[in-house]
Curated annotation (Swiss-Prot):
Subcellular localization: Cell inner membrane
Protein name from the UniProt record: Probable protein kinase UbiB
Transmembrane parts of this sequence: 501-521, 526-546
Membrane topology label: Multi-pass membrane protein
Xref: NCBIfam families: PRK04750.1 (NF003404), UbiB (TIGR01982)
Highest classification ranks of the organism: Bacteria, Pseudomonadati, Pseudomonadota, Gammaproteobacteria, Lysobacterales
Amino acid sequence: MKALFRACRIGKVMLRYRLDTLLDGTAAERWLRLAKPFVPRISAEIVEQSRGRRLRLALQELGPIFVKFGQILSTRRDLVPQDIGDELVMLQDRVEPFEGQTARIIIETALGKSVESAFAHFDTVPLASASISQVHAATLHDGREVVVKVLRPDIEHQISDDIALLKSLATLVEHTHPNADKIRPCEIVAEIETTLAAELDLQREGANASVLRRFWEASDDIYVPEVIWSHTAEQVLTLERMYGIPSDDIALLDASGIDRKALSSKGIRVFYTQVFRDNFFHADAHSGNIWVDSDPARKSNPRFIALDFGIMGQLSQKDQYYLAENFMAIFHKDYRRIAELHVEAGWIPPHVRIEELEAAARSVCEPYFTRPLSQISLAEVLMKLFHVARRYQLTLQPQLILLQKTLLNIEGVGRQLDPELDIWVVARPVLERILRARYSPRHALKELNKRLPEIMTHAPDTPRLIHTWLVQQVESRKQNDVYLQQIRALAMTLQGLQRRVVNAIVGSGLLVAAAVLYGLHPDGLYLGAIPVWSLISGCVGALALFSAWWRS
């Protein structure tokens, strides 16, 4: 019943914001039309709004889960039209906060102690409020300033209910919408469910921050705040407090004298290093989560501050290698290699013709190379390649989609900081250096040394395993020979059966012909009272039937 009321409310909000037009041609559209008389008249102000703005306002009204839905949609530019994607970006961190007293109760329950014993000071007025959690300022008893991230109350049940409802709606749209194969609603909902599950465990987010901090502890390019583990639990995360400037606040960056050119190049270098050196990248890197250190001493050598570690990405070694090779092939305009890599990586079925895939890659990439270098986007090229490859049954791991949208965000931040940023010039040497180091003899020896204990542990079992494998191969070959003989016998049986069926059909036909000729009394030779041709036909037919019967 609760789900029904929730569905009715969603339908009502959709009608009020005229979002039923997005479902034209579906079964849902007909149901929404029936409900129109029960919804207040649409105001002229709403009617005049763009569809993207109407969708954004509706998602805000429906609550935090639908805000998160919009946030994820805003990053899937391969699925969402540009006008809608641009509007949904504005959903980032614009959610009403919950009561500070409620936050205190959640903290005390999670940490098992009072707020007063955990903190010297705790501000009940939140610094920021997002769709899943909100952040409060606090001070530890040792004087350190921290921020405390607290999950929204009862958010798990609300997410579970809304996800179940979204799955039902997605299934309905997938079966009824004429463009469902392009929209892929079930895929979007599955991604939302995975993303939300990761963001609901703040202890996991703390672990992500801790790993990222370890990788970049000695860097001048990016700073990751320290996790205060003694004040962290599944529903509460306490981090060192940072002061900085949002990376999209260009006016304040200029007023602070920050070298934006140097900063934009650092952002690209950090991203490629995270992906190809560390294989652990920040996958929610929009401007709200990427700040710039406001320390006056860092004007000429600025650094980023990373925030919000709920979504991190990792690639398999195979995907990491093929992605790096793809980038290098794009740099060198080697379309044949791009096509081969898509097949070798298993992203495209092997039966697809390489020449056809090469032509598709050329049609995607060449228009980009006619632009000035400062206007070329690797994220767009990669997105278009993946989009075109869908025609050839492209299969991608979700982490690759995550990387593509993160690259889009990073390039957006970089271009905001420096509109003339040449991403290719910055990214190429970083990628080449990382690949040289990664596939160098020194790195191979390091990996061998790391695996040496494992190799030594399994070494005594190696002769036995080899012997077992050889025995299996011999037995398998014998078994294959038996199967082959059985198949040959079956083939001969089928051939014999086919001949008998043919003989039976021919014999029956000739006997029928003999009977017809006998009844017609044709002119010609007779043997007694029987026409010769009838006699011949009958004899041959009888022989054919006897042959079919005898072989059975």
